[in-house]
Every structure is written in C-alpha cells, then in structure tokens.
C-alpha cells in the first residue's frame, strides 16, 4: 500500500481528495464539523473512513509519576509546532496529591518559554497565520472574560520581526 500525506487547505487539497475516484480509504484527524463532511462525502461512494475528531488531547499525570520526567514531556506536548498539532496537549489532568507541586513547576517552565522567529534558538515559533493568531487570542480573551486564572504566560523575544504571528 501507499500512504500519501497531502498538506494544503481543506477547500483545495481536502475537497480534491474526497472527490477523487482513486482514493479508496480516508483518514481524517480534526474538527467534528469537518469530520462529518468527510464522512458524508465518503458515504456517497461507500469508501471506508477513519476519523479522530474533537481533540483536546489531555495529558494524565498520576500521583506516582516522576515529576522531573513528566515536566519536559508536558511542556513539549503543549508547544511542539507552536501548539498547532491535533495532538497538542491542551489539557493536563493531574491527580490531587501532586496537583499543587506540578502546577507550580509547570507554570514556572511555561513562563520561561520564549517565542519568536523559527530561525532563532527559541522554544516556540510563530503561529501559521494571522487568522490562527487571532483565533488563539480570542480563546485567551474569552478565558479571561470567564474568570479563568492564568498561571503562566510566555514571552516574545524583543528582536522578533514585526508582523510575525507571535
């Protein structure tokens, strides 16, 4: 068999693949809304489909975990590819006995992250587009309006180019 990964926007690459008669199986990871569209299109030709929908990718940390080992994994799981992967750790579920220690240490690690151009030796690069940046800023604004307490915030390096999606 052959596995082809075709990057591109859904309206272009995705639509073309969904309607192509040579595609005999679809696998989609993403939003429920788009997953339903993929499933409906696949059903028209009775093409098998595998869907992983919804996201949130929680990371689970139990009280017997080695926090020193868990911490770098949790940070990387959240910021890999600037958090723009379907498996980005958007939630961390922590067992009560270690909650205080882990959240304090995680907040300290996150606060030390620096964001900027991908060519510099930084922990986190820019978001893919202004649309995505605006979307993320909208999530943060709604969280603040809902009274969510932020435990940490990273920083943008001072010499980051203007117009970057940081």
Label the model's feature ranges.
Residues 1, 18-25:
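Short, surface-exposed connector motifs at secondary-structure boundaries
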Residues 25, 31-166:
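ALDH superfamily catalytic-core signature
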Residues 8-11, 22-23, 58:
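A broad detector of the eukaryotic-type serine/threonine protein kinase catalytic domain
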Residues 1-14:
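PLP-dependent aminotransferase-like
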Residues 14-18, 71:
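Short hydrophobic/charged patches on amphipathic alpha-helices used for structural packing
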